[in-house]
């Protein structure tokens, strides 16, 4: 009986394939339009940047907040990429999206930008006008 059961199971079981087929996560073509970067509460480390000015460029937009431990772990890497790849055309924009009221003052964002020595423009997004469309 065990042999008959085994044979029956083998007949109904789909063959197992060890071949891996990779699928793209997203379309390789750029999206049609970058959401607006307006609506922040000021800019640190430079003048306001518009989506139109970034058209055709390789852009990394880093959403972070200064009191987030995960953000604190990634900021040095983003900073290093900004420095390392700037000459090759990478543009980094920081969007500070506060979680708590004490993270909202522009002076707090400026202190964090100085502490982490961020060389790229950062816009505080206290009302989530910038981050929401993303």
Q: PLM features: residue spans?
A:
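Structural signal for short hydrophobic segments within the conserved structured cores
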Residues: 35, 120-121
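Short conserved loop adjoining the S-adenosyl-L-methionine
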Residues: 51, 130-133
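Structural microenvironment flanking redox-active thiols in thiol-disulfide oxidoreductases
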Residues: 72-116, 124-131
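N-terminal "domain-start" segment that seeds a small globular fold
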Residues: 1, 7-52
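Sec/Tat-exported extracytoplasmic proteins
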Residues: 38-41, 58, 67, 82-85
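Short active-site neighborhood of thiol/selenol oxidoreductases, capturing the structured segment around
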Residues: 48-72, 78, 92-95
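Active-site acidic short loop of glycosyltransferases
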Residues: 55-57, 87, 118
């Amino acid at each position: 009986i065990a042999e008959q059961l085994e044979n029956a199971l083998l007949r109904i079981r789909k063959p197992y394939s060890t071949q891996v087929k990779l699928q793209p996560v997203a379309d390789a073509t750029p999206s049609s339009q970058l959401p607006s970067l307006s609506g922040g509460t000021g800019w640190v480390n430079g003048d306001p940047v518009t989506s139109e000015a970034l058209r055709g460029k390789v852009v990394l937009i880093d959403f972070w907040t200064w009191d987030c431990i995960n953000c604190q772990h990634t900021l040095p890497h983003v900073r290093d990429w900004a420095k390392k790849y700037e000459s090759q055309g990478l543009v980094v924009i920081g969007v500070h999206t506060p979680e708590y009221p004490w993270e909202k003052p522009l002076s707090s964002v400026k202190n964090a930008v100085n502490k982490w020595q961020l060389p790229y423009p950062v816009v505080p997004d206290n009302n989530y006008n910038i981050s929401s469309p993303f």
